[in-house]
Swiss-Prot record:
Gene3D superfamilies: Phosphorylase Kinase, domain 1, Transferase(Phosphotransferase) domain 1. One of its GO terms (biological process) is regulation of meiosis I. Keywords: ATP-binding, Coiled coil, Kinase, Magnesium, Meiosis, Metal-binding, Nucleotide-binding, Nucleus, Phosphoprotein, Transferase, Tyrosine-protein kinase. SMART domains: S_TKc (SM00220). ATP binds at I221, G222, V223, G224, E225, F226, G227, T228, V229, K244. This is Wee1-like protein kinase 2. The keyword Repeat does not apply. It comes from Canis lupus familiaris. GO terms for cellular component: cytoplasm; nucleus. Phosphorylation leads to increase its activity. A motif (Nuclear export signal) lies at residues 318-332. It catalyses: L-tyrosyl-[protein] + ATP = O-phospho-L-tyrosyl-[protein] + ADP + H(+). Residues 1-103, 170-191, 502-567 are annotated as: Disordered.
Length: 567
């Protein structure tokens, strides 16, 4: 064989070995699926035999010279370009160019990459994937903008205490409140905290009716200023609830804020024995629906109407019970930093305690921390909470003018809790049998001057004065809800308890005085014993033994006989 043919054969073998080294080095970096397709390239003599054994899918030549082909040409050296086979050898897969890093895989340079992977690589490049060390794992990559948008859809309750509001969505520093997101975006204007609400929070689209699915409507039990109340049985637990449906759709911004305002008040008040319990709320068919506790005794207004028809009235003892229980509810509301501003008979509900089949053990009632838990009849504040506002940042909406305090009409909000006391005093007067209260006119002003309406029944002087003091023209002179809860007029047992407490404190003081005198006497006796003569007895009586030193100048006994001594 001549020299030219030998040189040509050696050159061809060198080219093949060079391709084999490149394919081996890249095979270690490629994914497992690319390792199978990128096998070592045989020499040209064995090309037909290897192709007969395995023929992978081929990309048409037009696709090879399409997307990404110019990048491959730029990365190849001039020597590699000379060794690249021509169009006639497109059946043999070429080795793709080595990627810049392990994390980047140029799918378009491999003729065996499906088009679906090519499209996914283009789409995924526009999204921000979560880091490997992230604690929150997602099945699908979610853009960062979506997470900010979902956080911004969380309403902030305006009645939530400021210290708690800063923490309730910032657990471990991972979540941000809606206000923080708004401050982070300088393009958005400042929005009042909690208002307006995001529209999508109040709408449920493409969903079955939750009201019809979860509840069985029994009857309509009331109609208020803001909605209609229905008695319903929940299909899951079989318990009875009061479901309130807003009268007007919440599509408008003002109606939407009003509906959310009532939900906010219900949610923050929580659970108290003298406040109707709130369970949940949702939007359905553009109406707000609130699930509350059901009170089987109806409203106080219904009971007053029945008494008026029958010519009866609540006795004074019952009136004191109503006043005391509602005062406890108002005390809880005022301590929560809010005022009701719509106290009236239609917003007070009655709950009769259900009798159990088994008798109640007396010890169980005695061990209760609160006396009202054993009461047979409970009075609770409920109704429309659309007028509830904050004491520190009031946004007052006037309630029923018949029970409205004059200072609210004059926009004097320095003593907002006392406006609830004024309305409660008139409510008890109506329950006592007073005629219907005027909405305006001379009689309206006469009551605001501190005069109770005419009450047909005779009340005790102390109770009458208490009611009169509750509607005092000066709100600062009215008692507080906490003061009413401690009133001796409403709780006569407190007087006896206070007397016993005073006697106990007096006896404790006497005992403490005696103990102090005893300690002083003991301290004075101890130094006297230390400085006394050791040879002299310190006690006049002979019961105390004396100490006598042995030896030295002490007298020694001269008789050791056991018999009788001689005279």
């Amino acid at each position: 064989m001549d020299d030219s043919s030998i040189n040509k054969e050696l050159k061809q073998k060198l080219n093949v070995s060079y391709c084999e080294e490149e394919s081996e080095s890249e095979g270690q970096k490629e994914a497992p699926e690319s390792r199978e397709t990128q096998s070592q390239t045989p020499d040209w003599a064995e090309g037909q035999e290897s192709e007969a054994k395995f023929t992978p899918p081929r990309t048409p030549s037009s696709s090879i010279h399409g997307v990404g082909t110019f990048e491959e040409k730029d990365k190849m050296s001039p020597d590699q370009a000379l060794r690249t086979p021509g169009p006639g050898f497109h059946k043999c897969p070429g080795t793709p160019a080595q990627p810049d890093s392990r994390s980047e895989v140029v799918h378009c340079e491999s003729p065996y990459t499906p088009k679906s992977l090519l499209s996914q690589s283009v789409i995924s490049s526009t999204e921000k994937l979560p880091s490997r060390g992230s604690k929150h794992l997602r099945f699908t990559p979610v853009p960062f903008v979506d997470e900010m948008t979902s956080s911004a859809l969380v309403n902030i309750n305006p009645f939530t205490p400021e210290s708690y509001r800063k923490q309730f969505l910032r657990s471990n520093g991972k979540r941000k409140t809606r206000g923080d997101l708004e401050e982070a975006d300088p393009g958005e204007g400042k929005v009042e905290q909690g208002l307006p609400a995001k529209r999508c929070v109040l709408r449920e689209t493409n969903m079955a009716s939750r009201y019809e699915k979860e509840f069985l409507e029994v009857e309509k039990i009331g109609v208020g200023e803001f909605g209609t109340v229905y008695k319903c049985i929940k299909r899951l637990d079989g318990c009875v609830y009061a479901i309130k449906r807003s009268m007007k759709p919440v599509a408008g911004l003002s109606n939407e804020n009003l509906a959310l305002h009532e939900v906010y008040a219900h949610a923050v008040l929580g659970h108290h024995p003298h406040v109707v319990r709130y369970y949940s709320a949702w939007a359905e068919d553009d109406h707000m629906i609130i699930q509350n506790e059901y009170c089987n005794g109806g409203s106080l207004q219904t009971a007053i109407s029945e008494n008026t028809k029958s010519g009866n009235h609540f006795p004074e003892l019952k009136l004191k019970d109503i006043l005391l229980q509602i005062s406890l509810g108002l005390k809880y509301i005022h301590n929560s930093g809010m005022v009701h501003l719509d106290i009236k008979p239609s917003n007070i509900f009655i709950c009769h305690k259900m009798q159990c089949d088994s008798p109640v053990v007396p010890e169980e009632i005695e061990n209760e921390a609160d006396w009202f838990l054993s009461a047979n009849v409970m009075y609770k504040i409920a109704g429309d909470l659309g007028h509830v506002t904050s004491i520190s940042k009031p946004k007052v909406e006037e309630g029923d003018s018949r029970f409205l305090a004059n200072e609210i009409l004059q926009e004097d909000y320095q003593h907002l809790p006392k406006a609830d006391i004024f309305a409660l005093g008139l409510t008890i007067a109506v329950a006592a049998g007073a005629e219907s209260l005027p909405a305006n006119g001379a009689k309206w002003h006469h009551i605001r001057e501190g005069n109770l309406p005419d009450i047909p029944q005779k009340l005790s002087e102390e109770f009458h004065n208490l009611l009169k003091n509750m509607i005092h023209p000066d709100p600062s002179e009215r008692p507080s809800a906490a003061g009413l809860a401690r009133s001796r007029v409403l709780r006569p047992s407190l007087r006896k308890a206070e007397e016993l407490q005073q006697q106990l404190n007096l006896e404790k003081s006497k005992t403490a005085t005696l103990e102090r005198e005893l300690r002083e006497a003991q301290q004075a006796w101890s130094p006297q014993e230390e400085h006394s003569d050791p040879g002299v007895s310190g006690t006049p009586t002979g019961s105390r033994c004396t100490k006598r030193p042995v030896g030295g100048k002490s007298a020694k006994s001269s008789s050791f006989t056991c018999g009788k001594s001689s005279p």
